[in-house]
Amino acid sequence: DNISGTMGHKNLLSSILFLTLPFVIYLIRVGKKLWRLLSIVLLACMLLIILQTQTRAVFVALGLFVITIAIVYKSQIKLKQLSLLLVSVIVGLSLFFTILKYTERYDAFVHEIHTALDYKNSLRYKLYKSSFYLISENPLLGVGPGNWKVKIPKYGLYFGSFGTNYAQRPHNDFLWVFAEGGLIPGISFILIFLILLRDSYYLHKNNKESTFFYSLLFATFIGFSFISFFDFPLERFSHNIIFFFLAAIIVAGKLRHTGYKKELLPKWLSFSFLGIIFFVIYVAIIRYQGEVYATNAINSQAEQDWTSVVEDIDKAY
């Protein structure tokens, strides 16, 4: 039941593959023969990996993606295309269950479904409930960046547990931002998604040259908002880079379509942005080093080398 990869977490691997879907699908439609063939092969590999990782949030996000595209183009879908879609879904589900049986992950998948249905006894429900208590006591300013995992034991997350597992985040980016940043960052994070959804749909309706690509982005943002609600892609820089790259495409497209006035920024503002960039780079380096030492500590723990565990944890902080 073990899966090996370079992303460090199977859910994060699936979610970053989902974020790249619009580029691959767009190339299948507009690319030349070689690029189209390569894109089809790449899409098949991506879907196969997503099936193998069994990330439920991404499964639902894929369903939302397909449903959104179907609704957006409902007037253009013909019976032949609908039949092809249904056949593809049936083939995909058949392939999925075949993979489950072949890799002996069927029982694990059924267990995950039962866990999801019995949500009140699940760890995720406890995460959300404790996070709501934390937010209710710190609604304006939050508890500060990186402090969710420090403050959350106070709100009953580990009551009745044996201390063998410790959560680093609430498995919900929206709750995470609210809990650590407070009201303004929490609302701002929600507004980012709402604005991107509004503008991507606007560009789909009004930009005839790239209407298909913007519809893909619209469906991607809907799916990714669901993933962010049940997972933690905000934790990884790789996800943030791709997400804000997609956001930049939407912002640039909206500015080109509606028009804008060029203005020179004051020098002090330019230097302020430069300072923020250097600070972000510094934080990224610190976090990267922390991840390296944390990984070393986990490996040392597996080898029961407790001296190295303490040393690596000290270096991680």
Language model segments and positions:
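Flexible juxtamembrane loops connecting transmembrane helices in multi-pass membrane enzymes
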Residues: 1-6, 65-66, 96-136, 153, ...
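Alpha-helical transmembrane segments of multi-pass inner-membrane proteins
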Residues: 1-102, 179, 188-209, 213-229, ...
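TM-adjacent membrane-interface loops and short helices in multi-pass inner/ER membrane proteins
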Residues: 9, 125-167, 174-177, 181-188
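Amphipathic alpha-helical repeat elements characteristic of tetratricopeptide repeat
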Residues: 19, 41-42, 125, 272-275, ...
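Soluble catalytic regions of membrane-associated enzymes that act on cell-envelope
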Residues: 155, 162, 286-317
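Short helix-adjacent coil turns
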Residues: 182, 207, 304-305
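TPR-adjacent "capping" and linker segments in tetratricopeptide-repeat scaffold/adaptor proteins
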Residues: 261-269, 275-292
